[in-house]
């Protein structure tokens, strides 16, 4: 399947809807916490066990993005979106089978492993294409697409909760909900497959700079630079801090206010998940667009510095005020989403657009690491605290202190980012081909 090149006159504004159709679908991953309570009840799982499909999905997202990034660059976004469609939908179908048979390992394999591959390939598939279509506004462009990933749970959370209420929270009801998800997302993602196009190579797009303007760094050279690894740490720390809340959002707010006169209902908890998704989505377009104005390093200073302050406020005062808890969580999740949306533009600023998709894919191994660290820290500590007889907000106090420390580490790593040494730059593809041709002729 060759990359579909846009014909003359093709509007670049048709590409973001194609990206959104994929990212809104795979963004369902952020609504996994809605399935945790019924799975724990139906299959007798602990909080740590019920997080496994989500954790494995994030691990596979990073690994498939890292190993598939170069392939996606070569084969193009339509091929990648097709692979994502097949894997993501198949993951739900396998999970439906696992739930109906009450075989939890099959849910972990289907949603986590197979679906996780779809997450990774689907996540990176439109990003480099959008950067090439919008070289003049890379932060806004990637924010539009990645906004969909953050907003997917805004749709999926109440939708999933309604299905579980209608179908029932037992294993058969969960299986039917998984089945409906898989089939519905397959249809929606197909729209993106049919619509996506790539810009003509090395041509300016609507008066902007050339698609390959400026210094370029290959993916192989990029991972040898300190800038890549500083950004890896920045992304890992920011994601760990956000994903720790997001993965356990519904039970967390219920636990936090369980001992108050106005406990949080299941419906309200699902609404909280939807609010977090809205903040996640808004942060992806809002903060990433802001980065086009104030710069990538400055916006990450906000994400990491203010994020640490928000965690401190929750740890100190969160259980005394629902509005404060919700507000701080929303700010943290907006920074979490903004961090994802801004990092492709940060990579473009440092390494150019030549292989930015492949570089982005390799950087997403930081997400894989964070996908294990965040839920593990929050769930494991909460389980141990519960075993010790503690309850309510005390289940999460130590976790939040750890998150503050991780954000400080990320802040320091961001301060260490500097422009890439010119020795890592490579010739643009045309120039490189000309040099190789001269060398072969002289030989």
Report the location of each language-model feature:
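Extracytoplasmic gate region of multi-pass secondary transporters
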Residues: 32-37, 157, 220-288, 371-378
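C-terminal transmembrane helical hairpin of 12-TM major facilitator-type secondary transporters
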Residues: 235-244, 267-343
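Glycine-rich segments within core transmembrane alpha-helices of 12-TM secondary carriers
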Residues: 137-158, 361-375
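C-terminal ends and interior cores of transmembrane alpha-helices
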Residues: 86-100, 306-319
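Intracellular juxtamembrane helix-capping segments at the cytosolic ends
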Residues: 39, 120-134, 141-142, 338-351
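C-terminal membrane-cytosol helix-exit motif in multi-pass small-molecule transporters
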Residues: 182-209, 410-418
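Helix-loop-helix hairpin linking two adjacent transmembrane segments in secondary transporters
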Residues: 149-198
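Helix-to-loop junctions at the C-terminal end of transmembrane segments
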Residues: 64-77, 283-296, 382
């Amino acid at each position: 399947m060759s990359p579909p090149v846009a014909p003359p006159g093709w509007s670049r504004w048709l590409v973001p809807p194609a990206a959104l159709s994929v990212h809104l679908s795979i963004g369902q991953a952020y609504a996994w916490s809605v399935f945790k309570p019924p799975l724990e009840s139906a299959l007798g799982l602990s909080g740590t066990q019920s997080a496994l499909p989500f954790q494995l999905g994030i691990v596979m997202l990073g690994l498939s993005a890292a190993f598939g990034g170069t392939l996606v660059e070569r084969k193009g976004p339509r091929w990648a979106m097709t692979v994502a469609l097949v894997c993501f939908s198949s993951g739900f179908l396998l999970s439906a089978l696992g739930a109906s048979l009450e075989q939890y390992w099959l849910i972990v394999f289907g949603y986590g492993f197979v679906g996780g591959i779809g997450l990774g390939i689907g996540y990176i598939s439109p990003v480099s294409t959008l950067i090439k279509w919008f070289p003049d506004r890379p932060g806004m462009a990637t924010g539009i697409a990645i906004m969909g990933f953050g907003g997917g749970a805004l749709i999926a959370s109440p939708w999933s909760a309604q299905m579980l209420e209608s179908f029932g929270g037992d294993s058969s009801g969960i299986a039917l909900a998984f089945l409906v998800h898989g089939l519905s997302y397959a249809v929606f993602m197909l729209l993106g497959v049919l619509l996506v196009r790539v810009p003509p190579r090395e041509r300016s797009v609507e008066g902007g700079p050339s698609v390959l303007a400026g210094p370029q760094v290959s993916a192989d050279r990029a991972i040898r630079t300190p800038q890549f690894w500083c950004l890896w740490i920045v992304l890992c720390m920011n994601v760990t801090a956000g994903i720790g809340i997001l993965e356990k959002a519904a039970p967390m707010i219920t636990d936090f206010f369980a001992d108050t006169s106005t406990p949080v209902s299941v419906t309200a908890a699902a609404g909280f998940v939807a609010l977090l998704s809205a903040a996640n989505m808004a942060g992806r377009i809002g903060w990433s667009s802001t980065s086009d104005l104030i710069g990538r390093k400055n916006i990450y200073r906000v994400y990491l510095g203010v994020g640490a302050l928000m965690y401190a406020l929750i740890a100190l005062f969160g259980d005394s005020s629902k509005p404060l808890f919700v507000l701080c969580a929303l700010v943290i999740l907006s920074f979490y989403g903004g961090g994802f949306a801004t990092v492709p533009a940060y990579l473009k600023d440092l390494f150019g657009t030549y292989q930015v998709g492949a570089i982005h894919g390799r950087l997403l191994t930081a997400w894989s690491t964070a996908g294990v660290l965040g839920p593990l820290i929050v769930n494991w500590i909460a389980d141990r605290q519960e075993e010790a007889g503690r309850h309510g907000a005390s289940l999460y106090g130590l976790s939040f202190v750890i998150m503050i420390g991780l954000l400080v580490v990320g802040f320091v790593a961001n301060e260490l980012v500097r422009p890439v040494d010119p020795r890592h730059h490579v010739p643009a593809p045309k120039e490189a081909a000309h040099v190789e041709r001269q060398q072969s002729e002289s030989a």
